[in-house]
C-alpha cells in the first residue's frame, strides 16, 4: 500500500477590521512608536470588537471562506480541530461552535492548546488523522483573540498582541507533498515565564485574582526572548538538516510572528535571505496560534506546487517546533 501523506489543499483566514496603532497604544501606556518598532517590529494590530464576540467569530469566517475556495460540501468534513489559547468558553469547545455555524455537522470536533506553537501541534495532529487512512477531510482552525487577555495597563505586553484566525484543509495524497516532517518540543521549565496566572483550576477566578490583574498575559520578556531566539532558530535548522535542505532548496520560511529580531535570527541560522521569509508582524502583531496560518493565507497566491516551506514557532510552556511542508498546489487565493 502506498504511503499516505497529508497535504494542505486550501487556506482560509480572517483578520478583524478595527486597527489599533502604536500611536493609540502610546496614549494608554508610556511607550512610543519608535520603541515598539525597534524592539519588536510591530506598527499596528487588528482587534476584534463587540460584546460576546470570541474566537469562534473569526474561526467561522475563516472556515466558511476555506469551504468556498475549495468547493467543499461542509457535510464531507470529518474532523474540525481548533488550536487556541483563547477559546470562547472553557466548555464547550470552540470547534463545536465553529462546526455548527459552518454546517460541518458530520465532523468530530475538539480543541488543542499549544500557545503560540499551536498551529504546528494542530497541523501534525490533523495530519496524523489523514495518515491513519480513516479520514479524508480534516479542517485545522488556528487563531486567537489575544486582546481578550491583554492588559492595556502593562506597557511590556500590550503593544505585542492582536487578533486573527486561519484555517487549512488537509486531504490525503500518495505523492510527496504536504506535511513531510515535524519536530515538536516542550520544556516545562518555561511555564512560569509566560502564563495567565489565574482563571484555571489551580487559581479559579475570585475578586482577588481580578483585582491583581491575573487574568491577563504575564511575560518575563527577557527570559522568553532568550529561549525563543535560540530554540526557534535551532529547530528550524534541525528539520532542514534532517531532510537535506539547503538554503537554496527552501522557497519560504514561515515563522511565528512574535518579534522581528527572532524572525531575523531564524532566517540567518538557515542562511536564507529575508525576501524568502513571510513577515506580516508589522500589520498584525502577535496573534499567537493565528500567525502562521495567516501568513499562509496572505502568501497563498505566491506559493507554487512543490515549494519547500519551513514553518517554525515558539510559545508558552515552553513549546516550540518546526514543520517541513511541501506545498501541494499553485496559488489560488480568492
Curated annotation (Swiss-Prot):
Pfam families: ACP_syn_III (PF08545), ACP_syn_III_C (PF08541)
Compartment(s) where it occurs, according to its Swiss-Prot or TrEMBL record: Cytoplasm
Alphabetically ordered keywords of this record: Acyltransferase, Cytoplasm, Fatty acid biosynthesis, Fatty acid metabolism, Lipid biosynthesis, Lipid metabolism, Multifunctional enzyme, Transferase
Reaction(s) catalysed by this chain's protein: malonyl-[ACP] + acetyl-CoA + H(+) = 3-oxobutanoyl-[ACP] + CO2 + CoA
GO MF annotation: an example: 3-oxoacyl-[acyl-carrier-protein] synthase activity
Predominant subcellular localization, coarse grouping: cytoplasm
Pathway per the UniProt entry: Lipid metabolism; fatty acid biosynthesis
Any one of the GO CC terms: cytoplasm
E.C. number: 2.3.1.180
Active site, per annotation: 116, 256, 286
Superkingdom field: Bacteria
GO biological process: fatty acid biosynthetic process; secondary metabolite biosynthetic process
InterPro entries documented for this protein: ACP_syn_III_C (IPR013747), ACP_syn_III_N (IPR013751), FabH (IPR004655), Thiolase-like (IPR016039)
Role noted for this protein: Catalyzes the condensation reaction of fatty acid synthesis by the addition to an acyl acceptor of two carbons from malonyl-ACP. Catalyzes the first condensation reaction which initiates fatty acid synthesis and may therefore play a role in governing the total rate of fatty acid production. Possesses both acetoacetyl-ACP synthase and acetyl transacylase activities. Its substrate specificity determines the biosynthesis of branched-chain and/or straight-chain of fatty acids.
Comment text on domains: The last Arg residue of the ACP-binding site is essential for the weak association between ACP/AcpP and FabH.
UniProt subunit comment: Homodimer.
Family in the record: Belongs to the thiolase-like superfamily. FabH family.
Name under which the protein is recorded: Beta-ketoacyl-[acyl-carrier-protein] synthase III
Name of the encoding gene: fabH
Amino acid at each position: 500500500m502506498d504511503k499516505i501523506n497529508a497535504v494542505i489543499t486550501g487556506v482560509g483566514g480572517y483578520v478583524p477590521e478595527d486597527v489599533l496603532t502604536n500611536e493609540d497604544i502610546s496614549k494608554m501606556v508610556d511607550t512610543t512608536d519608535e520603541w515598539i518598532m525597534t524592539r519588536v517590529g510591530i506598527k499596528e494590530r487588528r482587534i476584534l470588537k463587540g460584546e460576546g464576540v470570541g474566537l469562534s467569530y473569526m474561526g467561522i469566517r475563516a472556515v466558511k471562506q476555506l469551504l468556498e475556495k475549495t468547493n467543499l460540501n461542509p457535510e464531507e468534513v470529518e474532523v474540525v480541530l481548533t488550536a487556541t489559547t483563547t477559546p470562547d468558553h472553557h466548555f464547550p469547545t470552540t470547534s463545536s461552535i465553529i462546526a455548527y455555524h459552518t454546517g460541518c455537522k458530520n465532523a468530530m470536533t475538539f480543541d488543542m492548546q499549544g500557545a503560540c506553537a499551536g498551529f504546528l501541534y494542530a497541523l501534525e495532529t490533523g495530519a496524523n488523522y489523514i495518515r491513519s487512512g480513516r479520514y479524508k477531510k480534516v479542517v485545522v482552525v488556528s487563531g486567537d483573540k489575544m486582546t481578550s487577555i491583554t492588559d492595556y495597563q502593562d506597557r511590556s505586553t500590550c503593544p505585542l498582541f492582536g487578533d486573527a484566525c486561519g484555517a487549512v484543509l488537509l486531504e490525503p495524497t500518495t505523492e510527496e507533498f504536504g506535511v513531510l516532517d515535524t519536530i515538536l518540543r516542550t520544556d516545562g521549565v518555561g511555564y512560569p515565564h509566560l502564563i495567565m496566572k489565574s482563571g484555571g483550576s489551580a487559581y479559579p477566578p475570585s475578586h482577588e485574582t481580578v483585582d491583581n490583574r491575573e487574568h491577563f498575559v504575564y511575560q518575563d520578556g527577557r527570559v522568553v526572548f532568550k529561549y525563543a531566539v535560540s530554540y526557534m532558530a535551532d529547530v528550524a535548522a534541525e528539520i532542514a538538516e534532517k531532510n537535506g535542505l539547503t538554503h537554496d532548496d527552501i522557497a519560504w520560511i514561515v515563522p511565528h510572528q512574535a518579534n522581528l529580531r527572532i524572525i531575523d535570527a531564524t532566517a540567518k541560522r538557515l542562511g536564507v535571505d529575508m525576501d524568502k521569509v513571510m513577515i506580516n508582524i508589522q500589520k498584525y502583531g502577535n496573534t499567537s496560534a493565528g500567525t502562521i496560518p495567516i501568513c499562509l493565507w496572505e502568501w497563498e497566491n505566491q506559493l507554487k506546487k512543490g515549494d519547500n516551506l519551513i514553518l517554525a514557532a515558539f510559545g508558552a510552556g515552553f513549546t516550540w517546533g518546526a514543520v517541513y511542508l511541501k506545498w501541494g498546489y499553485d496559488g489560488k487565493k480568492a
